[in-house]
Amino acid sequence: MMRFYSLLLLFLTPFAGAVAQQGEVFIDSALPEGWNNGDCFDQTMPPDDEWWQNFEDPVLDSLILYASENSYSVLGAMENIRKARAAWNIARGKMLPTFDLGMGWQRAKTSGNIASTMYTEAWEGQFNAALSMQWQADVFGSIYMRSKAQKMLFMATEEEFRAVMVTLVANVATTYFSLCQSVEQLKVLRENVKSQREIMEIVISRYNSGLASKLDVAQSRSVYYSTMAEIPAMQATIDGYRNKMAVLLGIYPQDLAGWPGEECSLPSYMEPIGVGVPAMLLRRRPDIRVAEKQVEANAAQLGATKRDWFPEVLLTGSIGFSSGEMKHLFRSKSLTWEIAPTIKWNIFSGGERLNATREARAALDQSIISFNSTLLTAVQEVESAMSQYKSSVEQIVSLREAVNQNEETLTLSLELYKQGLTEYQNVLDAQRTLLTYQGYLVQAQGGSLIYLVQLYEALGGGW
């Protein structure tokens, strides 16, 4: 019988090696060699790993460090890694034999009304102690392939953790710059309120002297109070960003304790940055690596379903002691043992194995499609972020000049108004225009930093 098993395994093993070969080509089309909007960026250098340090803002650095250690999204991702590791260990453990240790006592009474017992009642007792073993020899690799699939899923979970970190760092930086932008806008409003109040006092003085109309006074007050009305709304916006920051840090807003406060300011950062080439995204972006590991996991699962078509090789056995009396249980004469190698080959399962293979193939094809979609989205996100950052920098240059010209316009119109050489309407228009473009400039400065953060995130975050 053992010779038959050996010949059967020798016959089937070569066929098992031909099942579910790996190495499918994941990428449908080659990645571009460069970026469409890369002329303002350094494509020869990869992105900085700790990119947030380029802003040289210690408050931002401390916020990111605190969030990376305390955010609930990070803690949840770490638990997912633990869960995935346990699932992988379970799958690996199935490649090993299982052992069971059992001890027991049995007592039975035989009937005295049966001829086989010679119409004599009898009591029988038996003590048992045995170590049993069962092992499925993974001759054709089914268990191994399932273990490999779980390993790939575990590695995908590690990449998902990195993706959470990349997103968290980007969210902290974006929220911080949005907060600083709102603080800068609040400063602009307060500075304009101060300037408008001074101008309003000039108009009132001229009105009292008979040099200005009551309409001029009403218009100056209208501008002043309109600007004042924007301050509470901007303060509420600041509070909203602070509350959002608290959530990212994993604390209550009450525990933020003025960190960050109204002293934060937007850093000036317009230096060319390294973006590398599109091919670097394959190794830098964790979401692409997650998709890649899912493809590999599904490929391994497909291999496992194909190997399920081959026989199972089982080995069971036990060794122990059995005796009618406890005092004789562990004597040599009480020793018992059993070994039973088995080959089990399911030749009909109602289409279960066939459809399991089809399902695994569909899952693999779907994951390959998802991989290519993720890759395409990654390239699009980088291109969009580069274009937005480039445009915002150009916009800042123009807006700075616009603000300078409007400041000069306000100064000149006010001087002419004091001399009675122009109407107050010119001063009024200059005030409104200056406030508008100062707000535009702050928005563009904050927006450029946010676009830069989005670019770093699209490039893989460097975590």
Predicted features and spans:
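Terminal intrinsically disordered/low-complexity segments used for targeting and assembly
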Residues: 1-69, 151, 235-283, 325, ...
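Short segments within alpha-helical structural elements
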Residues: 25, 197, 226-254, 305, ...
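Small/polar, glycine/serine/threonine/aspartate-rich low-complexity segments that form flexible
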Residues: 26-28, 37-56, 65, 103-132, ...
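Periplasmic alpha-helical coiled-coil/stalk elements that build and connect Gram-negative outer-membrane
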Residues: 28, 143, 152, 159-277, ...
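Transmembrane beta-barrel architecture of outer-membrane proteins
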Residues: 60-62, 83, 126-128, 174, ...
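Sec/SRP-type N-terminal targeting helices
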Residues: 75-76, 92-93, 137-165, 215, ...
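Membrane-embedded segments
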Residues: 79, 83-87
